[in-house]
UniProtKB/Swiss-Prot annotation:
Family: Belongs to the heat shock protein 70 family.
Region Substrate-binding domain (SBD): start-end pairs: 394-509
Protein's recorded name: Heat shock cognate 71 kDa protein
Binding locations of ADP: T14, Y15, G202, E268, K271, S275, G339
Domain text: The N-terminal nucleotide binding domain (NBD) (also known as the ATPase domain) is responsible for binding and hydrolyzing ATP. The C-terminal substrate-binding domain (SBD) (also known as peptide-binding domain) binds to the client/substrate proteins. The two domains are allosterically coupled so that, when ATP is bound to the NBD, the SBD binds relatively weakly to clients. When ADP is bound in the NBD, a conformational change enhances the affinity of the SBD for client proteins.
Function: Molecular chaperone implicated in a wide variety of cellular processes, including protection of the proteome from stress, folding and transport of newly synthesized polypeptides, chaperone-mediated autophagy, activation of proteolysis of misfolded proteins and the formation and dissociation of protein complexes. Plays a pivotal role in the protein quality control system, ensuring the correct folding of proteins, the re-folding of misfolded proteins and controlling the targeting of proteins for subsequent degradation.
A Pfam family hit: HSP70
Bias-annotated ranges (Gly residues): 616-641
Lineage: Eukaryota, Metazoa, Chordata, Craniata, Vertebrata
PROSITE patterns: HSP70_1, HSP70_2, HSP70_3
Localization in the cell: Cytoplasm; Nucleus, Nucleolus; Cell membrane; Lysosome membrane
Superkingdom field: Eukaryota
Region annotation (Disordered) ranges: 614-649
């Protein structure tokens, strides 16, 4: 395949989306199911790995081996409170590997564990394939988005996931900034406007304030919560119904993973219904121990269950306004992004906060982020299209960055909401006489003491010549690149000795070797997926060929055109093959192909004879079926064996 353009990928907690900029406009690309967003789900079964819709459709049957929300684990520690509380809601197993979380699943009959970055990389691979199928070209360059409030390790984890999936990540950009690009281009903003992006998705929440003027997008401030979204609203509803079930039936379903998963699917559906109706009913047959669960929930009750979470979305709005030094009256446009902004109560709270100002719903909340990422990908690849060539993006770093100085004090070198890329240098000195070295510990966060902030990494600068305290001059430089990822260096001015680290967050990061290993594993898994797909395709081909052959020779219209002996010969062979198929569903591709050849050996001469005697196609024969045509081989890329029928609660 020839080389395709760079794409923009919105790697979401619950859904992902991919877009490409070509012929002067953005195309959001639909997947093989015709959906423009793809669930960020990866499932492992006895025979195969499923990604996207296929994985989500079978989650009720296979809850413990279906991984979702990998984003919520990316770049976090196992003991992180967030990880611990999420684990209570997930049916799959999360294990502690050297204080890093890994998900544990059964795949092809063995136990396997994956880093969250690997799971995210599988979702990215799927998005890459969706783009390649549409473009008919290979895709290797991408811009990937992260929540604006993501810290350094979460950004780095996303970049690693891209590398593992075989993508060259041009840049990591913030979701609300990407959405602002979509808005700015859509609205053709000319004169300066202050725009507030309110982005509430499935797993994270961001508020960013930008000034847009003639193609320059300048982020003034950003705030948010990387752990608040639609999933949390679902959790509240699930807990509410578990309690109701206990009350009505005196049984606790919370330990039954399949029951909880079916309930969650129903809750997610009910939540969506409540955005347009004031009541939703839930009907789940035989939810637990044969008990049917029929109930309903009103919009008012749903709002009450989530009252604190909904109201809490206004805190980051206030913080972003304060940091941007703006009054709410100075905001020209309030733009809604992310599926959860469809919730009427959230819209009402936001509108009331801005004194009744109309909210802007002109951009598609599910696709805006991928749209903006695709535009940025085109710019970085040098697209000369007039609508994008003058576009300039000035983003900011969301958290203050600094080092620990005497007494555990956080000394900030780069304040939050500083435009990136940026570089700051500050000179420090020693704390005691003849101190031979200094330990440089790098932190991010807003608290005065480092113990309350997040340690990103540390390194030592040694070999400082003996001198009284306060004499040596150690120059520390923080350098943040366009991805929002930081390099730190320290130099002793007297000797010129230097030491530096890229903050690869030793605690939460994959080493280069890890990543290389995972890249190879990803290729191996992909090859296995392809083998499985070919196998299913060969099996389906054989099956449809056998059945078509049968129905062809049994056709009334062929009476007298084919001898009973020939007819019986074909029927016997077809029945033999169909019987073999029933017993050998898991055979290898070669075996299916061998059976097909054997069957064709019997059928082809008879069918050819039939053609010649009939002078062409006999009437009523399914056109072009018999002969060497391997039945209705599943289209390559079909993934699963025909449509999976899902249980709809």
């Amino acid at each position: 395949m020839s080389k395709g353009p760079a794409v923009g990928i919105d790697l979401g907690t619950t859904y992902s989306c991919v877009g490409v900029f070509q012929h002067g406009k953005v195309e959001i690309i639909a997947n093989d199911q015709g959906n423009r967003t793809t669930p960020s789900y990866v499932a492992f079964t006895d025979t195969e790995r499923l990604i996207g819709d296929a994985a989500k459709n079978q989650v009720a049957m296979n809850p413990t081996n279906t991984v979702l929300d990998a984003n919520r684990l990316n770049g976090r520690q196992f003991d992180d409170g967030v990880v611990q509380s999420d684990m209570k809601h997930w049916p799959f197993n999360v294990i502690n590997d050297n204080s890093r979380p890994k998900v544990q699943v059964e795949y092809k009959g063995e136990s396997k564990s994956f880093y969250p970055e690997e799971i995210s990389s599988m979702v990215l691979t799927k998005m890459k394939e969706i783009a390649e199928a549409y473009l008919g070209k290979t895709v290797s360059n991408a811009v990937i988005t992260v929540p604006a409030y993501s810290n350094d390790s979460q950004r780095q984890a996303t970049k690693d996931a891209g590398t593992i999936s075989g993508l060259n990540v041009l840049v990591i950009i913030n979701e609300p900034t990407a959405a602002a690009i979509a808005y700015g281009l859509d609205k053709k903003v000319g004169a300066e406007r202050n725009v507030l992006i309110f982005d509430l998705g499935g797993g994270s929440f961001d508020v960013s304030i930008l000034t847009i003027e003639d193609g320059i997008f300048e982020v003034k401030s950003t705030a948010g919560d990387t752990h608040l979204g639609g999933e949390d609203f679902d959790n509240r509803m699930v807990n509410h119904f578990i309690t109701e079930f206990k009350r009505k039936h005196k049984k606790d379903i919370s330990d039954n993973k399949r029951a909880v998963r079916r309930l969650r699917t129903a809750c997610e559906r009910a939540k969506r219904t409540l955005s347009s109706s004031t009541q939703a009913s839930i009907e789940i047959d035989s939810l637990y121990e044969g008990i049917d669960f029929y109930t309903s929930i009103t919009r008012a009750r749903f709002e009450e269950l989530n009252a604190d979470l909904f109201r809490g979305t206004l805190d980051p709005v206030e913080k972003a306004l304060r940091d941007a030094k703006m009054d709410k009256a100075q905001i020209h446009d309030i733009v809604l992004v992310g599926g959860s902004t469809r919730i009427p109560k959230i819209q009402k709270l936001l509108q009331d906060y801005f004194n009744g100002k109309e909210l802007n719903k002109s951009i598609n909340p599910d696709e805006a982020v991928a749209y903006g990422a695709a535009v940025q990908a085109a710019i970085l690849s040098g697209d000369k299209s007039e609508n994008v060539q003058d576009l300039l993006l000035l983003d900011v770093t969301p958290l203050s960055l600094g080092i620990e100085t005497a007494g555990g004090v956080m000394t900030v070198l780069i304040k939050r909401n500083t435009t990136i890329p940026t570089k700051q240098t500050q000179t420090f000195t020693t704390y005691s006489d003849n101190q031979p070295g200094v330990l440089i510990q790098v932190y991010e966060g807003e608290r005065a003491m480092t113990k309350d902030n997040n340690l990103l990494g540390k390194f030592e600068l040694t070999g400082i010549p003996p001198a009284p305290r306060g004499v040596p001059q150690i120059e520390v430089t923080f350098d943040i690149d366009a991805n929002g990822i930081m390099n730190v260096s320290a130099v002793d001015k007297s000797t010129g000795k230097e030491n530096k680290i890229t903050i690869t967050n030793d605690k939460g990061r994959l080493s280069k070797e890890d990543i290389e290993r995972m890249v190879q594993e990803a290729e191996k898994y992909k090859a296995e997926d392809d083998v499985q797909r070919d196998k299913v395709s060969a099996k389906n081909g054989l099956e449809s060929y056998a059945f078509n052959m049968k129905s062809t020779v049994e056709d009334e219209k062929l009476k007298g055109k084919i001898s009973d002996e020939d007819k019986q010969k074909i029927l016997d062979k077809c029945n033999e093959v169909i019987g073999w198929l029933d017993k050998n569903q898991t055979a290898e591709r070669e075996e299916f192909e061998h059976q097909q050849k054997e069957l064709e050996k019997v059928c082809n001469p008879i069918i050819t004879k039939l053609y010649q005697s009939a002078g062409g196609m006999p009437g009523g024969m399914p056109e072009g079926m018999p002969g060497g045509f391997p039945g209705a081989g599943a289209a390559p890329g079909g993934g699963s064996s025909g449509p999976t029928i899902e249980e709809v609660d």
